[in-house]
Amino acid sequence: MTNIHPTAIVEDGARIGNNVTIEPYAIVKKSVTLCDDVVVKSYAYIDGFTTIGRGTTVWPSAMIGNKPQDLKFKGEKTFVEIGEHCEIREFAMITSSTFEGTTVSIGNNCLIMPWAHIAHNCSVGNNVVFSTHVQLAGHVQVGDCVTIGSMVGVHQFVRIGSYSMVGAMSGIRRDIPPFTIGTGNPYALGGINKVGLQRRQVSFETRLALIKTFKRVFRSDESFQASLESVLEDFGEVPEVRHFVEFCRQPSKRGIERGVDCEASLEEPIDKKEGAFVES
């Protein structure tokens, strides 16, 4: 049964699903769609042509679908789409998009922690975690299963590849290749996100191929393009390696981050139980 508190403001025209809870003093504007089992906590504000997927919770004082912070916006009809079973925590802000018909999208099973900001025209994949105060500028693309630490700033038009992990307080100015881990301002790649991939049950053989790919691309004397070609020749049967190469070859407004933390070790075992080491 849907439960809307008497002090909540739900405008005529808002589409409310089954078993939705809207707590005291929350505001839901007329063009919003709340799917089944959504919870809108006290003082949350949801505006614009916003759709919130099943089972998602919007926590107190979060703001979703408000006017983009972009001087180019002239009142066009734009959208926000949030997937299923997400947690949009306190004071997070997800603005609407800029340019007619465009969408800010967030996938399923995402955790957006307090004070995070997702700007106009951003795209966020599934199973993503943004820690507190993560700040995405406009047009940023974030892949699936990405974790971004607290107080990270991301430049507009940057792409962050799937299964990557960005350390806290980093400044991201260029595209982050998938499956990598890094930190710093300026940002430096530290290697492959070995622990994260293991937790996602990526196979030992795939992790080993990705570590060798990273070393070939970022720590060899080959040119960037030549190293991408050579890893395809050696490890092209691994889908994750192909995805890594395709990401690096895609057109980019910011370019691929190539700064590497030379002190980061790539010689540790990627699975202690299996006892495998990677040659230095």
UniProtKB/Swiss-Prot annotation:
One GO MF term attached to the UniProt entry: acyl-[acyl-carrier-protein]-UDP-N-acetylglucosamine O-acyltransferase activity
InterPro entries for this protein: Acetyltransf_C, Acetyltransf_C_sf, Hexapep, Hexapep_transf_CS, Lipid_A_LpxA, Trimer_LpxA-like_sf
SUPFAM superfamilies: Trimeric LpxA-like enzymes (SSF51161)
Span of the signal peptide: none
Domain of life the protein comes from: Bacteria
Keywords: Acyltransferase, Cytoplasm, Lipid A biosynthesis, Lipid biosynthesis, Lipid metabolism, Repeat, Transferase
PROSITE patterns named in the record: HEXAPEP_TRANSFERASES (PS00101)
The reaction(s) this protein catalyses: a (3R)-hydroxyacyl-[ACP] + UDP-N-acetyl-alpha-D-glucosamine = a UDP-3-O-[(3R)-3-hydroxyacyl]-N-acetyl-alpha-D-glucosamine + holo-[ACP]
GO BP terms in the entry: lipid A biosynthetic process
Residues spanning the membrane: none
Biological or metabolic pathway of the protein: Glycolipid biosynthesis; lipid IV(A) biosynthesis; lipid IV(A) from (3R)-3-hydroxytetradecanoyl-[acyl-carrier-protein] and UDP-N-acetyl-alpha-D-glucosamine: step 1/6
Location of this chain's protein in the cell: Cytoplasm
Record has Repeat as a keyword: yes
Entry annotated with the keyword Lipid metabolism: yes
Enzyme Commission no: 2.3.1.129
One Gene Ontology cellular component: cytoplasm
Assembly notes: Homotrimer.
Annotated function: Involved in the biosynthesis of lipid A, a phosphorylated glycolipid that anchors the lipopolysaccharide to the outer membrane of the cell.
Similarity comment: family membership: Belongs to the transferase hexapeptide repeat family. LpxA subfamily.
PANTHER family, per the entry: ACYL-[ACYL-CARRIER-PROTEIN]--UDP-N-ACETYLGLUCOSAMINE O-ACYLTRANSFERASE, ACYL-[ACYL-CARRIER-PROTEIN]--UDP-N-ACETYLGLUCOSAMINE O-ACYLTRANSFERASE, MITOCHONDRIAL-RELATED
Name listed for the protein in its UniProt record: Acyl-[acyl-carrier-protein]--UDP-N-acetylglucosamine O-acyltransferase
Species, as recorded: Chlamydia trachomatis serovar L2 (strain ATCC VR-902B / DSM 19102 / 434/Bu)
Gene name as annotated: lpxA
